[in-house]
């Protein structure tokens, strides 16, 4: 099975990439796995008009500083995906896309992650798969035109 990684991070969204940044900075041997592409849920599980619900300046990931025209504006999810991809590239983060974790078990004090390409062993696993991919509407909004929601 090969080497034992210090950490495997599951999820290549903003949290997973931010964790990877710090792991790399501390020279921890790790990989980031995502079943899709970087920021996959931002690509496929957001409605067309979705914008981040915080000012752009608050969405800057570790090791970066804000660059852009409107620090207090709200960027689209498409712009955020581009930022995530650029961030991973600029910081040379070890992201493995199209790599779903099929099974996670403990074996001899290590975590065993089964993926389509093979099995990984790690001392630690971080699950960073997100929780903000569902639209929530109050019941009273049912009578509003869909373009307002």
PLM-predicted stretches and their roles:
Residues 2-15:
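Beta1/beta-strand and adjacent pyrophosphate-binding region of the FAD-binding site
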Residues 76, 129-149:
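Glycine-rich dinucleotide-binding loop and its adjacent helix/turn
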Residues 78-95, 101, 132-135:
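Helical element adjacent to the flavin cofactor pocket in flavoenzyme catalytic cores
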Residues 15, 37-38, 132:
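Conserved Rossmann-like nucleotide-cofactor binding loop
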Residues 8-10, 101, 119-133:
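Short hydrophobic core segments
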Residues 97-111:
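A conserved short coil-to-beta-strand element within the FAD-binding core of flavoproteins
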Residues 8-10, 21-47:
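Glycine-rich FAD pyrophosphate-binding loop
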Residues 33, 43-81:
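Glycine-rich active-site loop/strand segments that organize a redox cofactor
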């Amino acid at each position: 099975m090969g080497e034992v990684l210090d950490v495997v991070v599951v999820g290549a969204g903003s949290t997973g990439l931010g964790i990877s940044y710090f792991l790399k900075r501390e020279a921890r041997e790790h990989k980031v796995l995502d079943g899709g592409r970087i920021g996959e849920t931002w690509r496929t599980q957001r409605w067309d008009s979705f914008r981040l619900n915080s000012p752009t300046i608050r969405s800057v990931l570790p090791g970066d500083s804000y660059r852009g025209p409107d620090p207090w504006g709200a960027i689209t999810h498409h712009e955020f995906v581009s930022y995530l991809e650029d961030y991973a590239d600029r910081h040379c983060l070890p992201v493995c896309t199209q790599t779903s974790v099929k099974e996670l078990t403990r074996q001899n004090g290590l975590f065993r992650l089964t993926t389509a390409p093979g099995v990984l062993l790690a001392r630690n696993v971080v699950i960073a798969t997100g929780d903000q991919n569902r639209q929530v509407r109050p019941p009273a909004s049912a009578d509003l035109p869909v373009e307002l929601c």
